[in-house]
UniProtKB/Swiss-Prot annotation:
Subcellular location: Cell membrane
SMART domains recorded: 7TM_GPCR_Srsx
Keywords, in A-Z order: Cell membrane, Disulfide bond, G-protein coupled receptor, Glycoprotein, Membrane, Receptor, Transducer, Transmembrane, Transmembrane helix, Ubl conjugation
Positions bearing carbohydrate: 145, 154
Biological source species: Canis lupus familiaris
Membrane topology qualifier: Multi-pass membrane protein
Protein encoded by which gene: ADORA2A
Transmembrane portions of the chain: 8-32, 43-66, 78-100, 121-143, 174-198, 235-258, 267-290
Region named Disordered: 392-412
Record-given protein name: Adenosine receptor A2a
Amino acid sequence: MSTMGSWVYITVELAIAVLAILGNVLVCWAVWLNSNLQNVTNYFVVSLAAADIAVGVLAIPFAITISTGFCAACHNCLFFACFVLVLTQSSIFSLLAIAIDRYIAIRIPLRYNGLVTGTRAKGIIAVCWVLSFAIGLTPMLGWNNCSQPKEGRNYSQGCGEGQVACLFEDVVPMNYMVYYNFFAFVLVPLLLMLGVYLRIFLAARRQLKQMESQPLPGERARSTLQKEVHAAKSLAIIVGLFALCWLPLHIINCFTFFCPECSHAPLWLMYLTIVLSHTNSVVNPFIYAYRIREFRQTFRKIIRSHVLRRREPFKAGGTSARALAAHGSDGEQISLRLNGHPPGVWANGSAPHPERRPNGYTLGLVSGGIAPESHGDMGLPDVELLSHELKGACPESPGLEGPLAQDGAGVS
């Protein structure tokens, strides 16, 4: 590639790195600040964001360095080349975990709290990262081209003894990339996710039809299910974009491996597919902001407070049970009951059991405003009734005139 082309590639990669870091730091920041977003599903979202941050901080600089073909010891070059595979694998495992989490939430919601806990989610995330390093760094254990003789293709006459011209395809064997990396650990998980989301949508469609056939359909259950479907659609979009960004590069690798007599893909096309794969680390925050209201509102508050320096106290969206703190005239705590279940909301807006996680119906990711401590079957009628009771008990209290009372679903 020409010098101008190299500079264009490097400039685009650096821009992607900056956007990936800023956008995904914003995602982690939002989950940390907003209690409505602190749920099991978003643990996996944060893991996905961490992988995308690492792409911007490490993988893209490594890719730029490798593109220069600098001289290095073969195993040093191999580590640079394989590190991006670790991050790709972590992203795939996070997406698969999210898909399974949503499947459980819709298919067996009553067992969700028992099956999907914060402790288990953190353990699964740790296992996913360990497996990602094991899979991505497998070439370091011997499945590589470093054992080829010096006159082999991965050695440059301009490099010293024991050094190679550090280029990805010259140190990472293509059979590893195609059979092991792509077929086993990219394509299979993507197909599993496709099947999971298909079953989610079919199950949701069947349940909605059953509700329509009931003489007195439950509006709360219907609204909850619609919010779950909305969340599943948002996450399915993220999976689709991942496939769109990564499949072109893997398809080129397949052509290179299975058709050695065919001409190799032009260098500009290789760089274009590499840039496209790295672009995937940028898009997820935009999907969250566009599709999930709670993320969008929190992003806006963070930008106003910390970027534009417009000081305002951070408060979670007015749609959570945490935010339903009411005070009497003498400052005493008012005990609230939602559908006969005390949610444990205190006068200062905190809950006595912050470690409790929502069931499949009330994830902050789903509704963009349903609280982690709220009861799973609380719907708009309950909220309106509670609002009237609060107003009667303490007129100075803001009650529930926030977004939930206004548009109910809490979904953009």
